[in-house]
Amino acid sequence: MDRFSFFFAFYGLILGLAVTELLGGFAGMVRAHALKKLEAQTALLALLIFVLICATWVDAFDMSKGITLDFGDLWAPILLATFYYLAAAVVFPRDEAQYAHLHAYFAARRKFVVGMLIAAEAVDHAANISWYFDQHAHHPAHFWGWIIPYNIAIDGCFLALFFARGRRANIALLSALILLFLVPYWHQGVIDGLVMRLFGY
């Protein structure tokens, strides 16, 4: 087993457990015949976390060339996976009696879940800071034309979601975040390639 496979076995386990929490929570509602009570905010939050986990899984392959088995390289992905697991574990209630009050359940736990997602984004930014400097130095147009606006949009939506109070605002922000993460990962490299060609690289 090579170094990346050894790392990915542990990393994938944590991410897999996070997916299990999401699917298990949804399956619990199906078993309790409570699917009609599934609130839009909860459904979108679960979908967002699922998309984030899938995107993180895709990103893991970009790390395969230079991964080393030490805390210097592993702290970021392990923290990232841990934050996603904690967020996923809280999305759906474990008590069937709470299915009838999903709106209240969402409101009571929204800041914790979104806080975990913001923490994951902060870890991702910190881990990629050298890459940001490299892009700024060698591809400034791409850096200012895509990387910065894209990340500002994501971070802005997360912060707005953390402080949002209305149901409509929550739904709009969750939908926007899902689209923001789906677009560049739908076909890896397509958006980056378009931006690079736009700026003449």
Where are the regions that the model predicts?
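Hydrophobic transmembrane alpha-helical segments in integral membrane proteins
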Residues: 1-18
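Alpha-helical transmembrane segments of polytopic membrane proteins
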Residues: 8, 12, 71-82, 141-154
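Membrane-interface helix-boundary motifs at transmembrane edges
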Residues: 28-41, 64-69, 97-107, 160-173
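A generic, lipid-embedded transmembrane alpha helix
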Residues: 40-63
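Central hydrophobic cores of alpha-helical transmembrane segments
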Residues: 44, 170-182
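Alpha-helical transmembrane-segment detector that highlights a single hydrophobic TM helix
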Residues: 61-89
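Membrane-proximal helix-loop-helix units in multi-pass membrane proteins
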Residues: 81-150
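Juxtamembrane boundary at the C-terminal end of a transmembrane helix
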Residues: 133, 183-201
